[in-house]
Each structure stands twice: as structure tokens, then as C-alpha cells.
Amino acid sequence: YNGDIRYSGKSKNLNVGLSRVIQRNASGKTTLRSSVQVREIRNYIDRTEIEVQRRRTSAWLLGLDHRHYIGNATIDGGVSYQRGTRWFGAMPAYEEQYEDGYDATAKSKILTWTAGLNWPFALGNQNFRYQMNYLRQMSTTPLTSPDQLAIGNRWTVRGFDGERTLSASHGWYVQNTLAWQTPLPEQEFYLGADYGEVGGRSDGSTLLGRHLAGGVAGLRGNISALGLSYDAFGGTPLSKPHGFKTDSVTFGFSVSWQY
């Protein structure tokens, strides 16, 4: 065959949720939340659908979040439980239908813990801010790829291009960011260092590795007059498994507009 083969995918997501503040005082608040999720994924080679990769899943989620204020610092913590269902025409995962030795199921049972810290402080006449974000995912059953924890992108362990990740049914990561308030209003320069690990089976094969570490530097801020927020950054891997291919330096940016 001469020519390029085009691999593409389409996804649809619907998430309906409710939340209620069940406790509030001067030092913090506690929120109970619930949601129902429906997701459909279809993949194609050229214009022909790969039917064994079609997914239609649904799940319910119940979570509890707490925010607490200590001086200038804000501490967040949360826990949630997600359970896969057969609601709304959800289909069994193809891993459930084929005897490949990997008993992953779309009827997932996922427990997720989160924690965060936002601490503004001053050194001399300079203003700084330290941020920490932590997430741990645990599961009693092997998970299909959409439900696995994947590390190695701008949302988990920064410094990687995101073209390849480490994915498995359980794991954790922590992001650490130190930001300096520049003389320009609402503009921050920041440095970050992240680390993450995954465990369990990722599919029918053995994981390439179990941990990643990366660093990042960037500039972010708001342009209030235009309703714009931006984040421009560059990052690099600090530690990765042998054979894990990624760019030695990664650049990226994001822009959002509110009106």
C-alpha cells in the first residue's frame, strides 16, 4: 500500500452534576457533589470505523470536598468514588469480550483522593505564591484505557510533550509550583517541579516504567481589560524510564476569554 493511513477518533461526553454546601463557617466549607457521566468514543482508519475500539460507557460519581483557610493559605481536600454502570445504552468494553488475559471492565470502581495548597507569602518587598496539587487514584479492578490514570502531560507531570504517557489503573502525582508576582499587575513568573507514579497492569503487557519527573518554567496572568487569561511555558523531563520517548524540551500555551 502506497500512501498515508489516517487514524482518527471522535468522542462525545455528557456530565450532569449536582452539588450542595453542607457545612460553612468563617474558616472553610464542605461540599457534597454527585454526577452522572456518559461517554462515547469511536476510532477510524481512513473513513472505516474500528468497531472493536468503539466505547460507550456510563458511570455515577459521589464526592466530598473541603476547603479550609489558615491565615493567607487555602487548603483543599477531597475524595470521590466512581462506579461504572450499564445505564443509557452503555456497552461492555471490548476487553470484557475477548479472552486476552486482561480482565479490565467498563464497570469501573475508582476511588480518587485530592489535596491542594495555595500559600501567598512575601520575602522583603517581593510577593510569592506556592501551590501544591496532589491526586491519587486507586481501583480494585483493572481499568480500561479511558479510566486509567495517565501521567506525562501538562495536567499531571509537566515537562513532557504528552504524545506518550504512562498509564495504569492506579497511581499518583504531585505538582509543585513557586510563582513570583512581577512588577506588572496580575502577571506571574513561575517554576514548577512534578513527580508521579503509576502501578498495576496498563493493558495485557508490562508497563514500560512506573515513574516520571519533570520541570517547567512559565509566565501566566490576566489582562482584565480584555477579559483574557494566558499561560505560556516551557518544560523538560527530569527523570523517565529507559525507552520512554519524548521531546527534550516542550513549549506550550493556553488562552481563555471571558465576557
Role assignments for model-derived ranges:
Residues 1-66:
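Transmembrane beta-barrel wall of Gram-negative outer-membrane proteins
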Residues 2-5, 48, 203-206, 242-246:
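Short, solvent-exposed loop/turn segments at secondary-structure boundaries
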Residues 9, 166-170, 209-210, 238-249:
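Solvent-exposed loop/turn segments connecting transmembrane beta-strands
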Residues 44-195, 199-201, 240, 253-256:
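C-terminal outer-membrane beta-barrel translocator/porin domains of Gram-negative envelope proteins
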Residues 190-192, 227-235:
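Conserved active-site loop/cleft motifs that coordinate metal ions or position small ligands
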